[in-house]
Amino acid sequence: MGPAQITPHGATRIEVRAGSTTLAALRAEPVDPASAVAVLVPGYTGSKEDFAALLDPLRSAGLSVLAVDLPGQYESGGPDREDEYLPDPLGRTLAALVTDLACGGRQRVLLLGHSYGGLVARSAVLSGAPVTGLTLLGSGPGALPSGRRRALIDITEPVLRTEGIEVVQQLLETQDGIAEPPALAALLRARFLSSATAGLLGMAIGLRTEPDRVTELAAALRTAGVPCLVAFGEFDDAWPVPTQRAMALRLGAEIAVVPGAAHSPATENPDALLDALLPIWRRWLTAS
């Protein structure tokens, strides 16, 4: 993970309503009237800052941009119950936000969800979120499969329950073994320690138990006439690349492979991610 999260940008830190919930967000507006609003949803242990390197380029491309912290992430408060952080309830919250942004069809919304945020974004669409296009970035058809990332969740969950979030943070820093720039290390530490414990636990449960809902999503997208893009880094180590390709085929979705990136293209190679996203999004908007 590179220093992209601390990329300087011209976005404004705001709070937005999502149903009965208030979410922290970064908002960037183009000079001319926006062609659409791009809503960017981070993954497990992530935050709106994961999209920092995308904000100004997307704005320059004529889009309004809204990157959010999900409930319980970094600067967004959240409920105390772990089950409120599963993809379904978070998806309903996100759907409420998208519905407000769409203004009864007067504003087009491009929804992008990364990793766990992709599971939440699909739940939002299944809850009726009125989107013009859906992008699943480094996400999968259901629960996170066996591998290093799944094993890390299995290791840290009991520690989080018994020892607390600060001990888990120390454990993660030891496991990482990468010397980040001080400003980035400070951000990553602050956002993890600011996370709701119930949120970390609930999302971990979601990552291990979410069912395959691809057939259901494909039907919903087809009925609504909404296009879909499945994008992933060429070295993604969360959901295997063949799994994501198969998901795209089942969804009737386009595929974009981001070179020089693994599980987090927005931070690992944001320029290549933008090169993949923008032509497809422009085509969707032209056709809608």
Placement of each model-derived feature along the sequence:
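Catalytic active-site module of serine/aspartate enzymes centered on a nucleophile-bearing elbow/loop
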Residues: G252-S288
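Conserved loop-alpha-helix segment in the C-terminal half of the alpha/beta-hydrolase fold
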Residues: T223-A261, T267
